Amino acid sequence: MTARSEPAVTTALCESVLDEIGRVVVGKRAALNLILITVLARGHALVEDLPGLGKTLIAKSFAAALGLEFTRVQFTPDLLPADLLGSTIYDMQSGRFEFRRGPVFTNLLLGDEINRTPPKTQAALLEAMAEHQVSIDGVTHRLPEPFLVLATDNPIEYEGTYPLPEAQLDRFAIRLELKYLSEAEETTMLRRRLDRGSVAPTVQQVVDV
């Protein structure tokens, strides 16, 4: 999609993307619409909700529908900045120092439970989210374009967590909740699961952003 696209064409493409994602994600249309708007605006989204509400599935579905490379990182207390950004290591065979990219070098990064990692690692994302680059050992490395972060956290669990600082929260264009499905939506989800059997749901690419 480009800025020059006709509004009607852009709207139709957006609806097609949401419809395709809706084949595997039941309900949550309003939340999906907000996430898509954030993606088109090249922003980042923070989803604050309980586990098991489909956050990972939503992120994977958006990546597939939009033709984006997807990477998931589970944020844990022992996660280091180098585990996220990458590091410079010495290659014995070539006799040179080489930079090995971390999982942040992707199009759509799912930061799962971002509030479970210490502030030092949280801060490692600041430059990446704001400037789409990372600086390591005095060298700046550009990230792939587009670069989008979809982060999640559990807002009701505080033990073993580190609240996101204001500087980090400021990098997100939106904060939203997914909330539970309605009774009718839960019934639809169960029927789809029974009809599908053990076959995993798939999302087809609709457009290349």
Could you describe each region identified by the protein language model?
Residues 49, 112-113, 124:
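Walker B catalytic acidic pair
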Residues 65-93:
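AAA+/P-loop NTPase substrate/partner-engagement loops
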Residues 50, 84, 152:
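P-loop (Walker A) phosphate-binding loop of NTP-binding proteins
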Residues 91-96, 117-121, 129-209:
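Canonical AAA+ ATPase core
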Residues 39-76:
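Walker A/P-loop
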Residues 7-53:
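Pre-Walker A (pre-P-loop) alpha-helix and adjacent loop at the N terminus of AAA/AAA+ ATPase modules
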Residues 45, 109, 147:
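Conserved beta-strand position immediately N-terminal to the Walker
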Residues 34-37, 90-111:
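Conserved alpha-helical scaffold flanking the Walker A/P-loop in AAA+ ATPase domains
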